[in-house]
């Protein structure tokens, strides 16, 4: 582009100020196992001598500014029911107003920051748009609701013509874009989450499984399958199986899940740890034998970084095709049907009892993990390549 780049980046609930404060010191934020997307954005702006304006969703307002960046965390009000749709449109219009005040000539917008069709307004006003999709456009196992059909219909033009290129976290997302646009869309660039090899160096091989430890990491929500895990744990306790579940992460279901485990009398084998920092997560990956990702069909999973982190830690994964990451690491995964609680439990027992299968899956982790260390496949590298064309 001939004009100096002025890029607005709209991101979800990432702590972009924490990431910035560590980035300027040449460090990664300790709150995330992967390299944050905002720190990759800062690096791209620095490399291209661009001005950057980062707006993240938050529960409180914060702002920092220097010669190159304006970085804000903006509160997003909770809006139930139909008000949610109005809020999403309002958030998009608010981003548009900020982009105009900043005199942005490029806007990069993540999933969830507004409805996709609102971004066409930016394009009509001469601002280059780069949508960054971390989630599926719709739940691939469920029928579309009327409101979803309307939203997608309105969003078709953005992907077909009103953007410069499209960043996607998986091929499953790319396929949905192609389906939505009947194959007539702007260039699609796939990216992986980025990891430092040093963060996974010297993680020991799994100890003998006595007890077997199963790790869940991520948002603690019903649609992430956490209550399915509790049902499995209750069944294992009744059968006397020596299997412990470690639940790591925050979410609206954390306290209800913890209380349900106590009421069921399985709190010693179903441990809710809450939020865990990067060093704590390293310890959790090191002590576990298997990582489980039981996302249910009513969640629009885009990839699931925990699958990457499990593979990089040398731990097999149990998951279903709801998780698009499966196709990238299939040799290191035991696949089960979506939402099948019994099948998840059976898969864990099989890995516990069949040492040959477990070793086969564990060794496969070493084969498939290299793709996640490739810097040319990072979000930042994909964004930079778009900006340079």
Q: Can you describe what each PLM-predicted range is?
A:
Residues 331-342, 350-355:
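Conserved acidic donor-binding segment of nucleotide-sugar-dependent glycosyltransferases
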Residues 156-202, 272, 302:
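Donor nucleotide-sugar binding/catalytic pocket of nucleotide-sugar-dependent glycosyltransferases
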Residues 109-115, 133:
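Short His-centered aromatic/hydrophobic patch
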Residues 38-43, 93-100, 146-166:
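Membrane-proximal helix-turn-helix segments that form the acceptor-binding/catalytic region
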Residues 36, 212, 216-235, 252-255, ...:
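A conserved mid-protein helix/loop that constitutes part of the nucleotide-sugar donor-binding site
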Residues 258-276:
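Nucleotide-activated donor-binding/catalytic signature segment of Leloir-type glycosyltransferases, i.e.
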Residues 286-300, 315:
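Acidic donor-binding loop of glycosyltransferase active sites
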């Amino acid at each position: 582009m001939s004009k100096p780049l002025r890029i607005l980046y709209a991101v979800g609930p990432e702590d972009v100020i924490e990431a910035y404060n560590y980035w300027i010191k040449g460090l990664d934020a300790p709150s995330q196992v992967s390299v944050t997307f905002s720190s990759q954005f800062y690096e791209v702006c620095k490399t291209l001598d661009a001005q950057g304006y980062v707006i993240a969703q938050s529960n409180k307002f914060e702002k920092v500014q220097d010669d190159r960046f304006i970085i804000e965390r903006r509160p997003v009000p909770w809006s139930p029911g139909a008000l949610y749709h109005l809020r999403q449109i309002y958030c998009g219009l608010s981003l548009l107003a900020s982009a105009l005040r900043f005199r942005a000539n490029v806007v990069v917008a993540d999933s969830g920051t507004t409805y996709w069709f609102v971004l066409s307004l930016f394009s009509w006003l001469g601002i280059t748009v780069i949508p960054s999709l971390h989630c599926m456009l719709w739940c691939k196992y469920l029928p579309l609701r009327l409101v979803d059909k309307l939203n997608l219909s309105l969003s078709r033009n953005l992907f077909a013509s009103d953007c410069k290129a499209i960043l996607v976290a998986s091929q499953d997302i790319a396929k949905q874009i192609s389906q939505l646009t009947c194959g007539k869309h702007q260039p699609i660039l796939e990216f992986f989450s980025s990891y430092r090899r040093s963060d996974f160096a010297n993680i020991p091989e799994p100890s003998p499984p006595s007890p077997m430890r199963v790790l869940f990491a991520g948002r603690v929500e019903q649609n992430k399958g956490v209550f399915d895990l509790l049902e499995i744990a209750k069944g294992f306790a009744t059968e006397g199986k020596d299997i412990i579940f470690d639940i790591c992460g925050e979410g609206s279901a954390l306290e209800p899940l913890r209380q349900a485990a106590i009421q069921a009398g399985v709190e010693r084998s179903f441990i809710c740890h809450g939020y865990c920092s990067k060093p704590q997560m390293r310890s959790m990956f090191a002590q576990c034998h298997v990582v489980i990702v039981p996302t249910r069909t009513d969640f629009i999973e885009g990839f699931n970084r925990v699958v990457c982190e499990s593979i990089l830690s040398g731990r097999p994964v149990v998951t279903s095709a709801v998780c698009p990451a499966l196709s990238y690491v299939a040799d290191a995964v035991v696949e089960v049907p979506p939402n099948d609680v019994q099948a998840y439990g059976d898969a864990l027992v099989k890995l516990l009892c069949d040492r040959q299968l477990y070793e086969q899956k564990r060794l496969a982790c070493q084969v498939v993990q290299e793709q996640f260390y490739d810097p040319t496949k990072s979000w930042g590298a994909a964004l930079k390549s778009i900006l340079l064309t």
